[in-house]
């Protein structure tokens, strides 16, 4: 028998990563990380694109086989962090390129139940790729290489990426960039990050991609403008507060030193004490007495208030809660809605800072080219107008303000209630009733003719008016009566 040829380590690891047992998959994932670290450290080492595609094939099905949500999240984070096992930027980009190629190739075969975990995997891989750029100090060359890789593999018309991959990538890009670098990135660096999207929006012929870029990138920037300005004001306040605190500490230290020196000098000059010192002592004692009295009064008031509050709490505990009728639900008032809105704004994640005037000028330069389609130019001009308004200090308003929208809803509800309450229309005036009676009492000539015909028919038929005879019944009856009379006359003659 011919001895079996050993398979390459990439294929062996890929087979184990796609195994049925979770223990086997976890062990293969740990071995894969060690293998990547060991091979990438060699001067002649490194992976070919085909080898990385085989590795990602196994990682894809490793994620496919994981069903539990918490373990899916942990596995996705572990897979995404493999990018840091490569020691060179070129190797990292090759690894990321193989990932996006694998997702584009396998996207059609993902069913509805497994879609969410691959959405999560895409988000985590994008986040870790941005963290890799952050680890190198947000180098301009590193940023350009990463953006070129992403736009070429995902948003380029020749990439053949499905619309689901494109739309999800555009939805999560700004969010993940803000999470990773909102505290460090400047407005110029943020403009560099979104410049590829500006270029694609100006030249793309795919209306869906254009719409998604405008909604997920530019519209998000416009909507987050108030939060970005608020962050700037908070930073300025904290900086001014820290400066005042440092100045106050220096002033207190100098004042304390001066006070101690003056007290020592006064004590050495006059040990017996002057009248001023005595007066100050008396005034201090008077202040202390007044303070004691006021504190005593305040204590009594506090005791009374505490007793009242305890009684009120007891009453609230004694009163049973009101039961709502079946089918009703608790509805929060407008104040609760406002508080919820404020909480949402406060809980909003980090926000990126942008130079709105510079972004508007960049978009205008791209949109005003002759090669830009007219449809793209119109939509980009609207975005440019909003950005220039932001640069001028005016925030965009909603099409329908919240108060007006609430009034519209209330008006519709009131109209519906009124319609339900209104009774059926009935004659309210006596004149209307008399007119109706007169109209019924004086029928028209056509109705009189119909009534005359009916009365003539009834009179001709005879018999009770309720019974009707078939046509020709009278003639048949008359013909049947004559033979009976003849029979009776013949019998009498005999």
Swiss-Prot record:
Q: Name one GO cellular component term.
A: preribosome, small subunit precursor
- Record has Isomerase as a keyword: no
- What segments bear the compositional bias annotation Basic and acidic residues? 332-341, 401-413
Acidic residues bias locations: 244-304
- Residue positions, PTM Phosphothreonine: 455
Question: At which residues is Phosphoserine found?
Answer: 254, 434
A biological process from GO? rRNA processing
Q: What segments bear the compositional bias annotation Basic residues?
A: 414-423
Q: Which UniProt keywords apply?
A: Nucleus, Phosphoprotein, rRNA processing
Outline the segment boundaries, as ranges, of region: Disordered: 239-349, 388-494
Recorded hits in InterPro entries, A to Z, give: RRP1
Record has Translocase as a keyword: no
Pfam families, alphabetized: Nop52
Where can this protein be found?
Answer: Nucleus, Nucleolus
- Share what the entry says about its subunit structure, partners included: Interacts with C1QBP. Interacts with RRP1B.
Q: Which family is this protein grouped under? A: Belongs to the RRP1 family.
Q: Its function?
A: Plays a critical role in the generation of 28S rRNA.
Q: What is this protein called?
A: Ribosomal RNA processing protein 1 homolog A
């Amino acid at each position: 028998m011919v001895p079996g040829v050993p398979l390459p380590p990439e294929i062996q690891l890929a087979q184990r990563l796609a195994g049925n047992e979770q223990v086997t998959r976890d062990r293969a994932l740990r071995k894969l990380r060690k293998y990547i670290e060991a091979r990438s450290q060699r001067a002649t080492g490194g992976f070919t694109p085909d080898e990385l595609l085989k590795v990602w094939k196994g990682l894809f099905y490793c994620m496919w086989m994981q069903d539990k949500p918490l373990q899916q999240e942990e596995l996705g984070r572990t897979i995404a962090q493999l990018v840091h096992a490569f020691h060179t930027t070129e190797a990292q980009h090759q690894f990321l390129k193989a990932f996006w190629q694998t997702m584009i190739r396998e996207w059609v075969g993902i069913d509805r139940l497994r879609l969410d975990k691959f959405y999560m995997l895409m988000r985590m891989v994008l986040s870790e790729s941005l963290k890799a750029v952050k680890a190198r100090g947000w180098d301009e060359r590193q940023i350009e290489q990463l953006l070129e890789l992403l736009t070429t593999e995902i948003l380029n018309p020749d990439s053949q990426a499905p619309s689901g991959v494109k739309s999800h990538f555009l939805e999560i890009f700004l969010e993940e960039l803000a999470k990773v670098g909102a505290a460090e990135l400047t407005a110029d660096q943020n403009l560099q990050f979104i410049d590829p999207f500006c270029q694609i929006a100006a030249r793309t012929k795919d209306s869906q991609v254009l719409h998604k870029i405008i909604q997920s990138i530019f519209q998000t920037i416009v909507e987050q403008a108030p939060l970005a300005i608020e962050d700037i004001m908070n930073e300025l306040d904290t900086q001014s507060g820290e400066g005042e605190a440092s100045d106050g500490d220096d002033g207190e230290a100098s004042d304390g030193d001066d006070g101690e020196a003056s007290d020592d000098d006064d004590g050495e000059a006059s040990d017996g004490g002057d009248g001023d010192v005595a007066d100050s002592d008396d005034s201090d004692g008077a202040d202390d007495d007044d303070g004691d009295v006021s504190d005593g009064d305040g204590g009594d008031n506090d005791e009374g208030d505490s007793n009242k509050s305890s009684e009120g709490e007891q009453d609230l505990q004694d009163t049973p809660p009101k039961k709502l009728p079946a089918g009703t639900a608790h509805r929060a008032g407008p104040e609760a809605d406002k508080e919820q809105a404020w909480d949402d704004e406060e809980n909003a994640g980090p926000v990126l800072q942008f130079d709105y005037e510079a972004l508007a000028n960049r978009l205008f330069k791209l949109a005003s080219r002759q090669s830009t389609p007219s449809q793209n130019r119109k939509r980009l001009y609207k975005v440019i107008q909003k950005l220039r308004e932001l640069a001028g200090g005016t925030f965009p308003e909603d099409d329908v303000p919240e108060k007006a929208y609430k009034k519209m809803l209330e008006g519709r509800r009131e109209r519906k209630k009124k319609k339900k309450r209104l009774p059926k229309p009935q004659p309210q005036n006596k004149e209307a009733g008399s007119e109706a009676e007169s109209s019924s009492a004086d029928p028209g000539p056509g109705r009189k003719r119909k009534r005359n015909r009916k009365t003539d028919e009834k009179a001709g038929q005879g018999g009770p008016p309720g019974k009707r005879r078939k046509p020709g019944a009278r003639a048949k009856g008359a013909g049947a009566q004559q033979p009976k009379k003849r029979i009776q006359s013949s019998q009498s003659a005999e």
